[in-house]
């Protein structure tokens, strides 16, 4: 039996008898430990040898023997808990301790900086698993950030100013409006050791052609080593930014044959995935990264939904609650929570119904009915961005005839959506309308793969907003089901850089196709000793740029 298993058995005994010496029998102990009398005798011998207890046996069946505790179960439990923390076995820690508040405090005390075996380790507490890290698929906000730490594109979009920077390619040029050329760096390696080849770039980009944003790509070639040519059906001013977006990250061409690639992907980025399961994501600095090596050697993201629900609202936590050296960075998101009206629905495609719903479901009405807890994190939205005021308040019209029931759909693992849907249910019930709730996984929501009248979601945009606002929405298949046919004309204007984003957004809002609800306050709780931490528009920070100052003497 392993030492950890023996410790667990001892703790069960200690808890059963409250650490008090007692007279008992082998049979009684067998019932406590759920094993045979013979096995109990073996366990007691090992515990006695370890110096945890003294077992004074009396001969004869049914005779009561003396059990004397020499070690505190709490002390042993604390020792075992520290071992599990050190080994990042958080799920086992929860089973060992049992008390969620106690586990939370233990975890918070270990967040942030750790120095182990000469390595700097950053620990972060998060509220849900990050199970899909495959570029070109439906990615939520935090998955998008992680993918940027693991992969590279031909170009890179600077998170702070939106400027385009070299990445896998060091230079690029538009030879003609329909022909772009990218010059790649040599000797770039994937995390599994193989050198990047031009065929990896070609396969990564051509796999995206079926997607709306990339459908104008005609062909991708490599005329000479370390040169990639991209040919287009129609000009695209934004192509270099598009090839730096998270969907266009470069994968090894054999990615489909790699086991569990969506969960444990292989890229060329500053961090490689070491472990990714339901309770932990561990990424490690890639020593052969072609850029500056990351200063933090390892990032551990501990996933505990039942212990970190508040992080759904408050953001990323890198430090304990009770330290006086916390530093808080906050920003209002570039984006919003919103409602979409499905054009496939007979009710939602009716302008009068959409207008009536938007007049009823105002941000102020939702806030006034919501739990006060949320008011700290929600700011009323009157446009897609905080500085836009496109949703004009109008007088409430009478309810349209025949409107008695609606279906609202949102994605799972987002408790704020539960709160919003409850408030919507109350508002509509007061008007005689029953709201049916439908919860999907994120991929089905992203695809619009369900029958629904209204869809609840959120979007986070990044710099440059002129690129990301349209790109983020247009690449989402759900939007194709909810916006008008004009969207296909808008893509050409956007690619020509003649589509004014404020006007486009105002049109969607005023036509009651896209209904903003809230802007969310993003918060990042850091450590005083951390440097290089600047929160991005996704509520995270670039891991490879962060570092720790030495502890004070």
From Swiss-Prot:
A Pfam family (short name) is SBP_bac_5
Origin superkingdom: Bacteria
What the entry lists under CDD domains is as follows: PBP2_SgrR_like
Annotated segments matching region Solute-binding: 163-494
Sorted alphabetically, the Gene Ontology BP terms of this entry are: negative regulation of DNA-templated transcription; peptide transport; positive regulation of DNA-templated transcription
Question: Residue limits of the HTH marR-type domain?
Answer: 1-113
The regions listed as transmembrane in this protein's record are none
NCBIfam families registered for this protein in UniProt? PRK13626.1 (NF010149)
Q: What does this protein do?
A: Activates the small RNA gene sgrS under glucose-phosphate stress conditions as well as yfdZ. Represses its own transcription under both stress and non-stress conditions. Might act as a sensor of the intracellular accumulation of phosphoglucose by binding these molecules in its C-terminal solute-binding domain.
The protein's name is HTH-type transcriptional regulator SgrR
Q: Which organism does this record belong to?
A: Yersinia pseudotuberculosis serotype I (strain IP32953)
